Every structure is written in structure tokens, then in C-alpha cells.
Amino acid sequence: MTDIKKTIKFHGLEVANVIVRYFQREVNKPDVIKIQEFDATKDPQICETVNIQVVSEFVTITFYKNESDNIIIRRELIPTFIVEHIWVSDLQQ
């Protein structure tokens, strides 16, 4: 495992962490709701920067290999209607 520190941003501003809690329905069991959680500090994706934004009807999570050159590893979009809560931890001075 590498010790590269990833930068976490919320709407482009550096923060300590972002946690998004949301729910999903099971495909074969629509009555079953599964609570999911995205935690930027615990996410295993190796990247330089992860930027979380609420844009229109989605929470957009973008993983950058190189943010200054806009080289994106991948994006995830979570519909806002399934989001239960978003926690943003600011950087400590």
C-alpha cells in the first residue's frame, strides 16, 4: 500500500473529509433498502484528488489522477433523492 496523501475537496475547496450517506434498493428485493456510505478518507481508490460536489440532481464524486491537467480516473454520480445526509469536516488550523 502506498502512503500518498489524497487531497479531499468539497465544491473545489480543500476539506478534511466528506461523508455521504445514501440508500439503495436491492434489485431482486425492491422492499429491502440498503444504507450505503461514501467516506472520502476511507475510499480505496488511489488518486491525487477527490472532489465532491452537489450539482443539479446528483452528488458528483470525481477522482483525479492529476487535477491540474484535468486527468480523471473516474466519476460517480449519486442521485440526490436517495441521499440521506452529507457531512463535511473542515480542515483544522
Predicted regions and their residues:
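Anionic N-terminal interaction surfaces
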Residues: 1-53
